[in-house]
């Protein structure tokens, strides 16, 4: 008869106690480690309030991640993420025998601020956020999700303050596990939806390499039914006019190949009314010069628009070399877009004078 072997009861008890102690202590150790990583990010500093472990599903949650600007007077954080959930993809584990993760940002709020100067503005530039994400989530990512997020642009230095928001932001960035495959220049796919200014639906699709240099990508953006009066705080601050009524659609398609960017943007405005004599000139809170300026802007739109449909449409050609600037690809991308829109506006303005 074979002798049966069994583990001593004291060993089982000690192992159980050790696992319980580890389960209790590990979240605090992880939190302290991540906070140390987030404490030194140049102009920005991050903090995590708590970590929750769910070992039974191979997951952990980061609670209340806040990233704020250290210098300057910026009253809101760059990022506030109440919950970040990271879990192992069991499908990939069983199908491909690879350990990859899915990360979900729940109700994140990302806020950019124009403070009038670089010190008091908040753009997120100057930090390699991809490296910070890898530090926060030290596992091979395959998919990144955003659920019920908010994207905002604020300016607290003007009256009325500018507060533009896209709410109900839901996005999926998939196929990140193949970004190291050099044979596929645009391996990841991005799909996103949102409500701009409370009600205008936004749709965004892109194919790109999020860990690359933005040399190769395809992008499609569409926003419909923008109520132009919702933009008045922005137009008042940056162009000194108001919309009395009107709605708009905006479409943009861009493609980059080896750093060469090409595409177009097409704003379509309908039933636009910018100048109203009773509201703008007779309004005691506005001076005569401001009212006359809005009249000029409004008449310019009237000349350009389709008389039968009361519609103003324009196609703005966008092109440029992302490698031609001694700055980051993202900064070059913004500069090319800015130059295209400024050029289009100047061309239309000059055309109206003829």
Residue ranges and their predicted role:
Residues 64-173, 271-299, 313, 320-349:
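Secondary-structure transition motifs
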């Amino acid at each position: 008869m074979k002798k049966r072997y069994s583990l001593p009861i004291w060993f089982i008890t000690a192992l159980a106690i050790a696992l319980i102690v580890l389960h209790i202590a590990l979240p605090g150790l992880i939190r302290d480690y991540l906070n140390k990583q987030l404490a030194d990010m140049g102009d920005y500093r991050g903090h995590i309030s708590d970590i929750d472990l769910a070992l039974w599903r191979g997951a952990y949650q980061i609670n209340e991640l806040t990233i704020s600007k250290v210098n300057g007077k910026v009253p809101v954080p760059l990022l506030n993420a109440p919950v970040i959930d990271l879990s192992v993809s069991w499908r990939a584990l069983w199908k491909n025998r690879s350990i990859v993760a899915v990360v979900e940002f729940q109700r994140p709020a990302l806020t950019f601020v124009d403070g009038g100067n670089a010190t008091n503005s908040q753009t997120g530039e100057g930090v390699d956020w991809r490296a910070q994400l890898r530090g926060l989530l030290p596992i091979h990512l395959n998919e990144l999700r955003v659920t019920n997020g908010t994207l905002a642009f604020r300016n607290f230095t003007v009256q009325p303050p500018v507060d533009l928001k896209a709410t109900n932001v839901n996005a999926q960035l998939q196929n990140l596990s193949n970004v190291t495959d050099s044979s596929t220049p645009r391996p990841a796919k991005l799909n996103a939806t949102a409500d701009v200014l409370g009600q205008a639906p936004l749709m965004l699709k892109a194919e790109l390499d999020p860990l690359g240099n933005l040399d190769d990508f395809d992008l499609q953006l569409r926003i419909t039914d923008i109520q132009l009066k919702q933009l008045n705080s922005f137009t008042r601050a940056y162009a000194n006019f108001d919309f009395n009524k009107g709605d708009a659609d905006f479409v943009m398609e861009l493609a980059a190949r080896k750093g060469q960017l090409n595409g177009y943007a097409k704003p379509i405005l309908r039933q636009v009314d910018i100048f109203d004599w009773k509201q703008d000139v007779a309004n005691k809170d506005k001076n005569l010069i401001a009212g006359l300026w809005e009249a000029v802007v409004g008449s310019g739109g009237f000349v350009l628009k389709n008389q039968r449909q009361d519609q103003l449409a324009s196609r703005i050609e966008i092109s440029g070399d992302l490698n031609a600037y001694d700055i980051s690809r993202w900064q070059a991308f913004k500069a090319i877009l800015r130059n295209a829109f400024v050029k289009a506006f100047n061309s239309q303005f000059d055309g109206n004078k003829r």
